[in-house]
Design a protein with these regions (language model features):
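A short SAM/SAH-binding and catalytic strip from SAM-dependent methyltransferases
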Residues: 149-160
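C-terminal substrate-binding/active-site "lid" region of AdoMet-derived donor-dependent transferases
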Residues: 158-245
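S-adenosyl-L-methionine
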Residues: 1-67, 107-146, 150
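Conserved SAM-binding motif I beta-strand of class I
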Residues: 96-101
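Conserved class I S-adenosyl-L-methionine
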Residues: 71-80
Protein backbone atom coordinates (compact mmCIF):
# COMPACT_ATOMS: atom_id res chain seq x y z
CA UNK A 1 0.00 0.00 0.00
CA UNK A 2 1.35 3.43 -0.95
CA UNK A 3 1.83 6.26 1.53
CA UNK A 4 -1.07 8.30 0.11
CA UNK A 5 -3.48 5.37 0.15
CA UNK A 6 -2.49 4.57 3.72
CA UNK A 7 -3.46 8.09 4.82
CA UNK A 8 -6.71 8.21 2.87
CA UNK A 9 -7.78 4.83 4.28
CA UNK A 10 -7.30 6.22 7.78
CA UNK A 11 -9.37 9.32 6.96
CA UNK A 12 -12.23 7.79 4.94
CA UNK A 13 -14.03 4.48 4.54
CA UNK A 14 -14.36 2.92 1.10
CA UNK A 15 -17.85 4.42 0.83
CA UNK A 16 -16.47 7.91 1.52
CA UNK A 17 -17.59 8.31 5.14
CA UNK A 18 -15.06 9.96 7.42
CA UNK A 19 -13.14 7.96 9.98
CA UNK A 20 -11.65 8.80 13.39
CA UNK A 21 -8.19 7.18 13.41
CA UNK A 22 -5.91 6.63 16.40
CA UNK A 23 -3.36 9.44 16.71
CA UNK A 24 -0.38 7.10 16.61
CA UNK A 25 -1.50 5.43 13.37
CA UNK A 26 -2.23 8.78 11.71
CA UNK A 27 1.12 10.25 12.78
CA UNK A 28 3.00 7.27 11.37
CA UNK A 29 1.13 7.46 8.07
CA UNK A 30 1.58 11.22 7.71
CA UNK A 31 5.31 10.88 8.34
CA UNK A 32 5.65 8.74 5.22
CA UNK A 33 3.97 11.22 2.87
CA UNK A 34 5.99 13.29 0.43
CA UNK A 35 6.20 16.99 1.23
CA UNK A 36 3.05 18.79 0.11
CA UNK A 37 1.03 15.60 -0.30
CA UNK A 38 -1.07 16.13 2.83
CA UNK A 39 -2.23 19.51 1.51
CA UNK A 40 -3.17 17.94 -1.81
CA UNK A 41 -5.19 15.23 -0.08
CA UNK A 42 -7.00 17.70 2.17
CA UNK A 43 -7.65 20.28 -0.54
CA UNK A 44 -8.29 18.33 -3.73
CA UNK A 45 -9.67 14.91 -2.77
CA UNK A 46 -13.35 14.96 -3.85
CA UNK A 47 -14.35 13.67 -0.40
CA UNK A 48 -12.90 16.82 1.17
CA UNK A 49 -11.92 19.48 1.84
CA UNK A 50 -10.43 18.67 5.25
CA UNK A 51 -8.96 21.13 7.75
CA UNK A 52 -9.00 19.51 11.19
CA UNK A 53 -8.20 15.77 11.24
CA UNK A 54 -9.96 14.46 14.37
CA UNK A 55 -8.41 11.45 16.09
CA UNK A 56 -9.83 9.28 18.87
CA UNK A 57 -7.55 10.94 21.39
CA UNK A 58 -8.60 14.43 20.28
CA UNK A 59 -12.27 13.59 20.67
CA UNK A 60 -11.66 12.30 24.20
CA UNK A 61 -9.58 15.34 25.19
CA UNK A 62 -12.06 17.79 23.66
CA UNK A 63 -15.00 16.07 25.35
CA UNK A 64 -13.20 16.21 28.70
CA UNK A 65 -12.55 19.95 28.29
CA UNK A 66 -16.17 20.65 27.39
CA UNK A 67 -17.37 18.51 30.29
CA UNK A 68 -15.13 20.47 32.67
CA UNK A 69 -16.92 23.67 31.60
CA UNK A 70 -20.23 22.22 32.73
CA UNK A 71 -21.86 23.17 29.42
CA UNK A 72 -24.97 21.18 28.46
CA UNK A 73 -25.99 23.09 25.33
CA UNK A 74 -23.24 23.13 22.70
CA UNK A 75 -23.34 24.71 19.26
CA UNK A 76 -20.69 24.14 16.62
CA UNK A 77 -20.66 27.00 14.10
CA UNK A 78 -18.98 26.96 10.68
CA UNK A 79 -19.34 23.20 11.09
CA UNK A 80 -19.13 22.18 7.43
CA UNK A 81 -20.03 18.51 7.20
CA UNK A 82 -20.68 18.39 10.96
CA UNK A 83 -18.18 15.57 11.48
CA UNK A 84 -16.65 17.00 14.66
CA UNK A 85 -20.03 17.40 16.35
CA UNK A 86 -21.04 13.90 15.29
CA UNK A 87 -17.80 12.51 16.75
CA UNK A 88 -18.38 14.29 20.07
CA UNK A 89 -21.97 13.19 20.65
CA UNK A 90 -21.18 9.64 21.87
CA UNK A 91 -18.50 11.07 24.19
CA UNK A 92 -20.82 13.74 25.63
CA UNK A 93 -24.03 11.89 26.35
CA UNK A 94 -26.52 13.99 28.26
CA UNK A 95 -25.56 17.15 26.37
CA UNK A 96 -27.21 18.71 23.35
CA UNK A 97 -24.79 19.26 20.46
CA UNK A 98 -26.05 21.11 17.39
CA UNK A 99 -24.01 21.90 14.26
CA UNK A 100 -24.64 24.87 11.97
CA UNK A 101 -23.04 26.43 8.89
CA UNK A 102 -24.07 29.21 6.53
CA UNK A 103 -23.20 27.16 3.45
CA UNK A 104 -21.10 30.04 2.09
CA UNK A 105 -18.21 27.74 1.19
CA UNK A 106 -20.28 25.30 -0.86
CA UNK A 107 -18.77 27.17 -3.80
CA UNK A 108 -15.03 26.42 -3.53
CA UNK A 109 -14.14 29.85 -4.91
CA UNK A 110 -15.66 31.44 -1.80
CA UNK A 111 -12.87 30.05 0.38
CA UNK A 112 -10.04 31.07 -1.95
CA UNK A 113 -8.05 34.26 -2.22
CA UNK A 114 -7.86 35.97 -5.62
CA UNK A 115 -4.41 34.44 -6.12
CA UNK A 116 -5.69 30.96 -5.33
CA UNK A 117 -8.56 31.37 -7.77
CA UNK A 118 -6.06 32.20 -10.50
CA UNK A 119 -3.71 29.38 -9.50
CA UNK A 120 -6.42 26.73 -9.44
CA UNK A 121 -8.40 27.88 -12.45
CA UNK A 122 -9.44 24.74 -14.31
CA UNK A 123 -8.57 22.48 -11.37
CA UNK A 124 -11.37 20.48 -9.71
CA UNK A 125 -11.56 21.74 -6.12
CA UNK A 126 -14.38 20.52 -3.85
CA UNK A 127 -16.60 22.89 -1.95
CA UNK A 128 -17.65 22.40 1.67
CA UNK A 129 -20.70 20.14 1.69
CA UNK A 130 -23.01 20.52 4.65
CA UNK A 131 -23.79 17.32 6.55
CA UNK A 132 -27.35 16.08 6.76
CA UNK A 133 -27.69 17.12 10.41
CA UNK A 134 -26.10 20.56 9.95
CA UNK A 135 -28.53 23.47 10.25
CA UNK A 136 -28.11 26.17 7.61
CA UNK A 137 -27.61 29.33 9.64
CA UNK A 138 -24.75 31.76 9.84
CA UNK A 139 -22.95 31.73 13.16
CA UNK A 140 -24.65 34.62 14.96
CA UNK A 141 -28.13 33.65 13.75
CA UNK A 142 -27.52 30.12 15.04
CA UNK A 143 -26.53 31.50 18.46
CA UNK A 144 -29.70 33.59 18.64
CA UNK A 145 -31.80 30.57 17.72
CA UNK A 146 -30.09 27.86 19.80
CA UNK A 147 -28.97 29.87 22.86
CA UNK A 148 -25.96 27.67 23.57
CA UNK A 149 -23.78 27.78 26.65
CA UNK A 150 -20.66 26.85 24.71
CA UNK A 151 -19.82 27.60 21.07
CA UNK A 152 -17.34 25.30 19.34
CA UNK A 153 -15.54 26.46 16.22
CA UNK A 154 -12.75 24.95 14.16
CA UNK A 155 -10.60 26.61 11.52
CA UNK A 156 -12.35 29.95 11.14
CA UNK A 157 -10.77 32.15 8.46
CA UNK A 158 -8.97 35.29 9.64
CA UNK A 159 -11.37 38.14 10.30
CA UNK A 160 -13.64 39.46 13.03
CA UNK A 161 -16.08 36.57 13.36
CA UNK A 162 -14.25 35.05 16.34
CA UNK A 163 -14.48 38.36 18.20
CA UNK A 164 -18.21 38.52 17.44
CA UNK A 165 -18.66 35.04 18.83
CA UNK A 166 -16.81 35.97 22.03
CA UNK A 167 -19.05 39.02 22.35
CA UNK A 168 -22.22 36.97 21.87
CA UNK A 169 -24.46 35.94 24.81
CA UNK A 170 -22.65 32.65 25.54
CA UNK A 171 -20.51 31.40 28.44
CA UNK A 172 -17.65 29.94 26.42
CA UNK A 173 -16.16 29.91 22.92
CA UNK A 174 -13.86 26.95 22.33
CA UNK A 175 -11.73 27.67 19.25
CA UNK A 176 -9.58 25.15 17.42
CA UNK A 177 -7.25 27.11 15.17
CA UNK A 178 -3.78 26.90 13.69
CA UNK A 179 -0.52 28.78 13.88
CA UNK A 180 0.76 30.89 11.02
CA UNK A 181 -2.12 33.30 10.43
CA UNK A 182 -4.38 30.89 8.54
CA UNK A 183 -7.00 31.21 11.31
CA UNK A 184 -7.61 34.09 13.79
CA UNK A 185 -4.35 34.84 15.56
CA UNK A 186 -2.99 36.13 18.83
CA UNK A 187 -4.83 39.46 18.56
CA UNK A 188 -7.89 37.59 19.87
CA UNK A 189 -5.99 36.95 23.10
CA UNK A 190 -7.05 40.44 24.20
CA UNK A 191 -10.14 38.63 25.42
CA UNK A 192 -10.03 36.63 28.67
CA UNK A 193 -9.07 33.07 27.80
CA UNK A 194 -7.37 29.82 28.76
CA UNK A 195 -5.03 27.77 26.59
CA UNK A 196 -5.98 24.10 26.22
CA UNK A 197 -2.62 22.36 25.88
CA UNK A 198 -4.08 18.96 26.73
CA UNK A 199 -6.34 19.24 23.66
CA UNK A 200 -3.61 20.71 21.44
CA UNK A 201 -1.34 17.72 22.04
CA UNK A 202 -3.92 15.47 20.40
CA UNK A 203 -5.06 17.80 17.59
CA UNK A 204 -3.96 17.10 14.02
CA UNK A 205 -4.68 19.26 10.98
CA UNK A 206 -3.82 19.69 7.31
CA UNK A 207 -0.57 21.50 8.23
CA UNK A 208 0.89 18.62 10.23
CA UNK A 209 3.06 17.00 7.58
CA UNK A 210 5.52 15.77 10.20
CA UNK A 211 3.51 15.59 13.44
CA UNK A 212 6.31 13.90 15.36
CA UNK A 213 8.48 16.97 14.72
CA UNK A 214 6.02 19.86 14.81
CA UNK A 215 2.33 20.42 15.50
CA UNK A 216 0.36 23.43 14.27
CA UNK A 217 -2.99 23.35 16.07
CA UNK A 218 -3.84 25.91 18.74
CA UNK A 219 -6.84 25.40 21.04
CA UNK A 220 -8.16 28.30 23.12
CA UNK A 221 -11.13 28.60 25.47
CA UNK A 222 -12.51 32.15 25.56
CA UNK A 223 -14.93 33.50 28.15
CA UNK A 224 -18.02 34.69 26.31
CA UNK A 225 -20.11 37.74 27.17
CA UNK A 226 -22.27 35.78 29.64
CA UNK A 227 -19.27 34.56 31.64
CA UNK A 228 -18.54 36.52 34.85
CA UNK A 229 -14.85 36.73 33.90
CA UNK A 230 -15.45 37.98 30.37
CA UNK A 231 -13.11 40.90 29.70
CA UNK A 232 -11.08 42.56 26.96
CA UNK A 233 -7.60 43.91 27.55
CA UNK A 234 -6.85 47.37 26.21
CA UNK A 235 -3.73 46.99 24.06
CA UNK A 236 -1.48 50.01 23.50
CA UNK A 237 1.57 50.58 21.29
CA UNK A 238 4.52 48.86 22.92
CA UNK A 239 2.44 46.10 24.50
CA UNK A 240 3.37 42.56 23.45
CA UNK A 241 0.01 41.95 21.77
CA UNK A 242 0.29 45.15 19.73
CA UNK A 243 2.44 43.36 17.14
CA UNK A 244 -0.53 41.11 16.29
CA UNK A 245 -3.02 43.88 15.56
CA UNK A 246 -4.78 43.59 12.18
CA UNK A 247 -3.08 45.39 9.32
CA UNK A 248 -4.52 46.40 5.98
CA UNK A 249 -2.53 44.72 3.21
CA UNK A 250 -2.59 46.53 -0.12
CA UNK A 251 -3.86 44.49 -3.03
CA UNK A 252 -5.52 41.77 -0.98
CA UNK A 253 -8.95 41.84 0.59
CA UNK A 254 -9.33 40.59 4.14
CA UNK A 255 -13.05 40.05 3.68
CA UNK A 256 -14.17 36.40 3.78
CA UNK A 257 -17.72 35.00 3.61
CA UNK A 258 -19.25 34.63 7.06
CA UNK A 259 -19.73 31.04 8.10
Amino acid sequence: MGARENVTRLLWTRSGARRIPPTRALDAALGRLAKGELFRICEFDPRGPLYLLPTRELVRALAARIRACGARRILEVAAGDGFLSAALRPALRGTRIVASDSGAWADPRARMTAGERREFRGVSVPGVRLGGCVLRFDALAAIRRMRPELVLVSWLPPGRLLERLIGAPVLYVLEIGAKGGVTPGAWSWRFAHEFCEEVERNARCRLDERPRLELHSRVTLYYGARHPEHARERVRPGDWLWQFRPRVTAGRSSVRPQR
